[in-house]
């Protein structure tokens, strides 16, 4: 499974690791993804999602149903 947030679509970023002598090598900055079980009140069940920690904070603010609607995700498939 690819390392992509299921709600925000956030994925890895290409960057440079810069040494003291300023030599640059490419590195991958991965997203901080967590598996999370979230109670879905409208579906009356738990939904297991792979979310970035930024999405978890936004989820507490917006709520699961409205956040999934914004992202265009059908929660019945999870």
Curated annotation (Swiss-Prot):
GO BP terms, alphabetized: translation
Cysteine disulfide partners in this protein: none
Keyword Ribosomal protein found: yes
InterPro entries the UniProt entry points to: Ribosomal_bL28, Ribosomal_bL28/bL31-like_sf, Ribosomal_bL28_bact-type, Ribosomal_bL28_sf
Cellular component annotations (GO), alphabetically ordered: ribonucleoprotein complex; ribosome
Molecular function per GO: structural constituent of ribosome
Matching Pfam families: Ribosomal_L28 (PF00830)
Record keywords, A-Z: Ribonucleoprotein, Ribosomal protein
Classification via SUPFAM superfamilies: L28p-like
Family indicated by similarity: Belongs to the bacterial ribosomal protein bL28 family.
Listed PANTHER family: 39S RIBOSOMAL PROTEIN L28, MITOCHONDRIAL, LARGE RIBOSOMAL SUBUNIT PROTEIN BL28M
Protein name: Large ribosomal subunit protein bL28
Natural source organism: Cyanothece sp. (strain PCC 7425 / ATCC 29141)
Gene of this entry: rpmB
